[in-house]
Amino acid sequence: MSHGQPDLLNHYARKILTSRVYDVAIETPLHGARQLSERLGNQVLLKREDLQPVFSFKIRGAYNKLAQLTAEDAARGVVTASAGNHAQGLALAARELGIQATIVMPRTTPEIKVEGVRSRGATVVLHGDSFPEALAYSLKLVDEQGFVYIHPYDDPDTIAGQGTVAMEILRQQPGQLDAIFVPVGGGGLIAGIAAYVKYLRPEIKVIGVEPDDSNCLQAAMAAGERVVLSQVGLFADGVAVAQIGHHTFEVCRHYVDEVITVSTDEICAAIK
């Protein structure tokens, strides 16, 4: 980690402080994990983003991105490809802002996820048997229908929306805070958190956590540049990303202290 980009921190700090997320997102609590704290001999706090209206932090970035669109772009409608939390977040954000949203999902997406998106007012298009095929079709719709593509993580407004998580953490825990551990997929959440934390409290470590079979950020940090993983794991599908984002890596390479990995067995043990 280097600290050579103060303009980058200033840029994101301003964007985070002016992000529009609380029209739909809530400030989630920091809950003490008593048993885990006792086992580790340390105070462990959990940021309960599972309490958001769509059960994940993704609503923050999606809403902030849509709220920053010009009236002209908003009128064009938006599209994305997702089978997970980004789809739910974008659907709800679009409904709240009165924007037409189309979500392209692979045909293999479980029906409960499809209905979750439809119930929030978005149009669902089932296409392809994999995420890359769904993504390619969503980009085709951009060309054919004139939609605005909303990236799930690699966008400064999305990163800033996710960064409001850090704003809350530092407000809720103003005293001693040694490290913040952040799950990493494409890097939107950790980039937003790292930018805000290093702007205000640079002594706090920001540590990324990835599955050992989907470690795109760890690989990029080691190489000093973005790399493409030859394959990614299937178990932790929400963070199974082959290449870290361009905008997200721009922040992470300077302001993430460390990236650690966990095995599928360790993930399963933690879920239990």
What are the residue ranges of the model-derived segments?
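PLP-dependent amino-acid enzyme catalytic core
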Residues: 1-272
